[in-house]
Amino acid sequence: MARSISNVKIVSAFVSRELSNAIFRRGYAATAAQGSVSSGGRSGAVASAVMKKKGVEESTQKISWVPDPKTGYYRPETGSNEIDAAELRAALLNNKQ
């Protein structure tokens, strides 16, 4: 009998703690959502207009993809050549001497 009462106390403490955490988290999420809606009314429209304009500018620039001569993988034509870290280190050390 005493063992079952002890188990009930442990389970009830765990359930009440988890229930309290769930209620607190839910309240915080609802408050955060209300704050973002009320403060972002007008600035949200401005941001979306800027995003639309930026999207139009990006779509007008056409970037062609060409195969890389070393690897054979396709990459943007405007991309710069990558240098190996060991080669860069060797080049910098040779210039210092």
Curated annotation (Swiss-Prot):
Induction: In short-day conditions, follows a diurnal pattern of regulation, with transcription repression in the light and activation in the dark. Induced by oxidants (e.g. hydrogen peroxide H(2)O(2), menadione and paraquat). Accumulates in response to abscisic acid (ABA) and dehydration. Induced by ethylene, more strongly in the younger leaves than in the older ones. Up-regulated 12 h postinfestation (hpi) in green peach aphid (GPA; Myzus persicae Sulzer) infested leaves. Triggered by cold, wounding and salt. Strongly induced by the necrotrophic fungal pathogen Botrytis cinerea.
Expression sites by tissue: Expressed in roots, stems leaves and flowers, but not in seeds. In short days, observed in cotyledons and roots but absent from rosette leaves.
Entry keywords, A to Z: Mitochondrion, Plant defense, Stress response, Transit peptide
Residue interval of the organelle targeting sequence: 1-46
Gene: SAG21
Family annotation (InterPro entries): LEA_3a (IPR004926)
Keyword Protein biosynthesis listed: no
Predominant location: mitochondrion
Entry protein name: Protein SENESCENCE-ASSOCIATED GENE 21, mitochondrial
Similarity comment: Belongs to the LEA type 3 family.
Assigned GO CC terms: mitochondrion
Subcellular location: Mitochondrion
Disruption phenotype: Early flowering and senescence, as well as reduced shoot biomass. Short primary root with reduced lateral root formation and short root hairs. Enhanced sensitivity to the fungal nectroph, Botrytis cinerea and to the virulent bacterial pathogen Pseudomonas syringae pv. tomato, but normal resistance to an avirulent P.syringae strain.
Entry's Gene Ontology BP terms: cellular response to water deprivation; defense response; leaf senescence; regulation of defense response to bacterium; regulation of defense response to fungus; regulation of leaf senescence; regulation of photoperiodism, flowering; response to abscisic acid
Record's function text: Mediates tolerance to oxidative stresses (e.g. hydrogen peroxide H(2)O(2), diamide, menadione and tert-butyl hydroperoxide) by minimizing the negative effects of oxidation and monitoring photosynthesis during stress. Promotes root development. Prevents premature aging (e.g. senescence and flowering). Involved in resistance against compatible pathogens such as Botrytis cinerea and Pseudomonas syringae pv. tomato.
UniProt KW Protease keyword: no
